[in-house]
């Protein structure tokens, strides 16, 4: 199976072999004849998201590391940067530029051979899922949405902390204690563990050789790379362990059997797996441990394994996979060492997700439980929006309150507010502003979740430092919210950057459902009876010409929203009247690409602006395309 995530940018290339070793790459080049310029691409076993280029020349194989830069480009050390591994290979087919020769002929994977996955790729999906479950106590759709929207960040988080789940990692123990642990039980050559030496990211590899325990210091350099003295550098400990399980490469011997951590009773919890025969050197032959990564089960969220008691460590005779995580829960990791994720906020899940917070049967709230601040957050034809606090059963919830003008006494305005409340009470998604309820008191009030940073367009106008990948992250979240609306048979009808509110710089929610309509199961569009005060510059041609609204017309609006986001909150069709915009669209013309906007994102905008509604993509397709591009640029 092809690996996802880190190798996604190369999986489509027929000459990409995935997580193979240098020796395996050389064997393939020999199969291909070793002609000068014959080459293949493989996944780096040292650097997260990196690759290695193996090239034949002079009957020898030459290997070049391709690192992924912080801005998402790829480069061979000291060479030019390229948008993708494919672009890099194409460039070096025309310019040697530091390579031993030009790349002349790719060696493609034999028929039926898929890119090989590494140990982390095999474990990653389950590790991420369990990490999200246990860290934020999420289930169902909230869990799925968290994984989809934050997968690149979660992958990096898991990749750099995965060693904590591995049986060979013993945390911060002393040199003397590590020797005692290694010498307990079998004396298999290559038996090993890794311990933390200090709080600065320094570790030690403890390795058994001919009855003696050897200690190799593992240092972290200024860029965060890990290595033994004079050894290869790695992004993670598990990559280092994987490498030295294949070849000694400076060690006295390869790593074979990990010293696993034992519970207080001296038993290893295998989560129901059958026990395997006792450890034997042949079982742990070089490279063999990688090929035996198996599925595993985690404890239920909240289950905590008792910590090992000092002096009560003994070695089980059960064979243990060094790449299989320990059956212990993830430690909560919400400290200052990482940026807050949407799941860290109080508005990711519904306020009624807590079973003790009983959702009222009626949407009406008790005014006595609502406190309002004097300062206005915004205003419009309907009235004002203020910040407030609503006393729920267990917590006080910070809320935004839309207050109808007191003097209006316009039944139409009240009907609009109630219609909006009716739509909102049916929606529950992390990327949509949820309604808490409505209040009938000195004025009619709609009580909603709070998004502190306000409208997306205004935020971007005032924060030009926000990077492309951050904008891609936000518009992807909007597409997830709109995909949910599409699946729920709702048409928004007022999708624009002004109606996307930011909870944090990395968390967006769709708001303002005043024009929204619920479609019946047998309907795929809503037909307005009359032309109202419509945001024409965001509307698809069929809305303007035929008053027909559907999820596909929301897709058109989403394209305009994307243009607003990548132009940092500029107004679309600036200086043009609605009739001029309509005429422009009828001629097949569209807005130009915002300065600095990635070409792929402008291409997606134009796809959203497909004139014929039947040929325009739905949000399922738009979200998937955005997701793939987002994963590619953020990884």
Curated annotation (Swiss-Prot):
Changing residue 630 to F: Loss of interaction with BLNK. Residues 371-631 form the Protein kinase domain. Pfam families: PK_Tyr_Ser-Thr (PF07714), SH2 (PF00017). InterPro entries: Kinase-like_dom_sf (IPR011009), Kinase_SYK/ZAP-70_inter-SH2_sf (IPR023420), Non-receptor_tyrosine_kinases (IPR050198), Prot_kinase_dom (IPR000719), Protein_kinase_ATP_BS (IPR017441), Ser-Thr/Tyr_kinase_cat_dom (IPR001245), SH2 (IPR000980), SH2_dom_sf (IPR036860). Residues 108-167 are annotated as: Interdomain A. Disulfide bonds: none annotated. SMART domains: SH2 (SM00252), TyrKc (SM00219). The modification Phosphotyrosine is found at residues 28, 47, 131, 296, 323, 348, 352, 364, 484, 507, 525-526, 546, 629-631. Widely expressed in hematopoietic cells (at protein level). Expressed in neutrophils (at protein level). Within the B-cell compartment, expressed from pro- and pre-B cells to plasma cells. Changing residue 550 to Y: In IMD82; constitutively active protein tyrosine kinase activity. It comes from Homo sapiens (Human). The gene is SYK. Ubiquitinated by CBLB after BCR activation; which promotes proteasomal degradation. Autophosphorylated. Phosphorylated on tyrosine residues by LYN following receptors engagement. Phosphorylation on Tyr-323 creates a binding site for CBL, an adapter protein that serves as a negative regulator of BCR-stimulated calcium ion signaling. Phosphorylation at Tyr-348 creates a binding site for VAV1. Phosphorylation on Tyr-348 and Tyr-352 enhances the phosphorylation and activation of phospholipase C-gamma and the early phase of calcium ion mobilization via a phosphoinositide 3-kinase-independent pathway. Phosphorylated on tyrosine residues in response to IL15. Belongs to the protein kinase superfamily. Tyr protein kinase family. SYK/ZAP-70 subfamily. This is Tyrosine-protein kinase SYK. ATP binds at residues 377-385, 402.
């Amino acid at each position: 199976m092809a690996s996802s995530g880190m190798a996604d940018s190369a999986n489509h290339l027929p000459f990409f072999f995935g997580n193979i070793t240098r020796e395996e790459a050389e064997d393939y080049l020999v199969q291909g004849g070793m002609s000068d310029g014959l080459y293949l691409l493989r996944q780096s076993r040292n650097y997260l998201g990196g690759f290695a280029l193996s090239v034949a020349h002079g009957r020898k194989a030459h290997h070049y590391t391709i690192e992924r830069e912080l801005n998402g480009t790829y480069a061979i050390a000291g060479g030019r940067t390229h948008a993708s591994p494919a672009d890099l290979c194409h460039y070096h087919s025309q310019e040697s530029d530091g390579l031993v020769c030009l790349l002349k002929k790719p060696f493609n994977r034999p028929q039926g051979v898929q890119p090989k996955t590494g140990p982390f790729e095999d474990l990653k999906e389950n590790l991420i899922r369990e990490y999200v479950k246990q860290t934020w106590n999420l289930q169902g759709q909230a869990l799925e949405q968290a994984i989809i929207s934050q997968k690149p960040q979660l992958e990096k988080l898991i990749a750099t902390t995965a060693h904590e789940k591995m049986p060979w990692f013993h945390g911060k123990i002393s040199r003397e204690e590590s020797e005692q642990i290694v010498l307990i039980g079998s004396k298999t050559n290559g038996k090993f563990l890794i311990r933390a030496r200090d709080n600065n990211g320094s570790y030690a590899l403890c390795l058994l050789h001919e009855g003696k325990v050897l200690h190799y210091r593992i240092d972290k350099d200024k860029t965060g790379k890990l290595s033994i003295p004079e050894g290869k550098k790695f992004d993670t400990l598990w990559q280092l362990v994987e490498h030295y399980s294949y070849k000694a490469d400076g060690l006295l011997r390869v790593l074979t059997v990990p010293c696993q951590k034992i519970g207080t009773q001296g038993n290893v919890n295998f989560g129901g797996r059958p026990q395997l025969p006792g450890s034997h050197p042949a079982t742990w032959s070089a490279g063999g441990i990688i090929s035996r990564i198996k599925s595993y089960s985690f404890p239920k969220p909240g289950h905590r394994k008792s910590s090992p008691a000092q002096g009560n460590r003994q070695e089980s005779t059960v064979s243990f996979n060094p790449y299989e995580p320990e059956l212990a829960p993830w430690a909560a990791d919400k400290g200052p060492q990482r940026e807050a994720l949407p799941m860290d906020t109080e508005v990711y899940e519904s306020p009624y997700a807590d079973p003790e917070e009983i959702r009222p049967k009626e949407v009406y709230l008790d005014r006595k439980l609502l406190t309002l601040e004097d300062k206005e957050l915004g205003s419009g034809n309907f009235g004002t929006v203020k910040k407030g606090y609503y006393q729920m059963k267990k917590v006080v919830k910070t809320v935004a309150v839309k207050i109808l003008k007191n003097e209006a006494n316009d039944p139409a305005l009240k009907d609009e507010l109630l219609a909006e409340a009716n739509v909102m009470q049916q929606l529950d998604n992390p990327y949509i502003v949820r309604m808490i309820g409505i209040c009938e008191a000195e004025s009619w009030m709609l009580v909603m979740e709070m998004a502190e940073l306000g409208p997306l367009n205004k935020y971007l106008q005032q924060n030009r430092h926000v990077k492309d990948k951050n904008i891609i992250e936000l518009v992807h979240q909007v597409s997830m919210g709109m995909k949910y609306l599409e699946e729920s048979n709702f048409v928004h009808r007022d999708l624009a950057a002004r109606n996307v509110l930011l909870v944090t710089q990395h968390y967006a929610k769709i708001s303002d459902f005043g024009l929204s309509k619920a479609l019946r199961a047998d309907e795929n569009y809503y037909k307005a009876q009359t032309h109202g005060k419509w945001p024409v510059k965001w509307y698809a041609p069929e809305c303007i010409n035929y008053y027909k609204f559907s999820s596909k017309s929301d897709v058109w609006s989403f394209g305009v929203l994307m243009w607003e986001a990548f132009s940092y909150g500029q107004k679309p069709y600036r200086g043009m009247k609605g009739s001029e915009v309509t005429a422009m669209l009828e001629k097949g013309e569209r807005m130009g690409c915002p300065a600095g906007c990635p070409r792929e994102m402008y291409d997606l905008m134009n796809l959203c602006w497909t004139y014929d509604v039947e040929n325009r993509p739905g949000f399922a397709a738009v979200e998937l395309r955005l997701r793939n591009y987002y994963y590619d640029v953020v990884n």
